[in-house]
């Protein structure tokens, strides 16, 4: 049985946001851009701020140029550390598996903009 959604916009339940952001080598805004972080997050929790997140790290420079890492999982954005699964990849990261740890480094509550650090632990062939 599917339960009716709780009418509570504070959790963003039911919302879907697409992303296409710079993927950088380090946290500071002026860090070297190495690709794009593209995907979506959808409000999936009715009683807390929790998202279903699907994201590709698409590399556009260096030895990883043309390769991707694909991430899928639950993202409770106000938790200090969030762990999500690496479900695959392409190019150098073909058949990738592993996990990422996400940590919010900066957040603007007025705009919803954030800088998030992702540490990737990936096994691939």
UniProtKB/Swiss-Prot annotation:
Coiled coil: none annotated. It is found in: Secreted, Extracellular space, Apoplast. GO terms for biological process: phenylpropanoid biosynthetic process. The keyword Transmembrane does not apply. Keywords: Apoplast, Glycoprotein, Secreted. The keyword Chloroplast does not apply. Its main location: secreted. Glycans are attached at residues 8, 30, 65. Gene3D superfamilies: Allene oxide cyclase-like. GO terms for cellular component: apoplast. InterPro entries: Allene_oxi_cyc_Dirigent, Dirigent. PANTHER family: NUCLEOPORIN-RELATED (PTHR21495). Homodimer. Belongs to the plant dirigent protein family. Dirigent proteins impart stereoselectivity on the phenoxy radical-coupling reaction, yielding optically active lignans from two molecules of coniferyl alcohol in the biosynthesis of lignans, flavonolignans, and alkaloids and thus plays a central role in plant secondary metabolism. This is Dirigent protein 22. It comes from Arabidopsis thaliana (Mouse-ear cress). The lineage of its organism: Eukaryota, Viridiplantae, Streptophyta, Embryophyta, Tracheophyta.
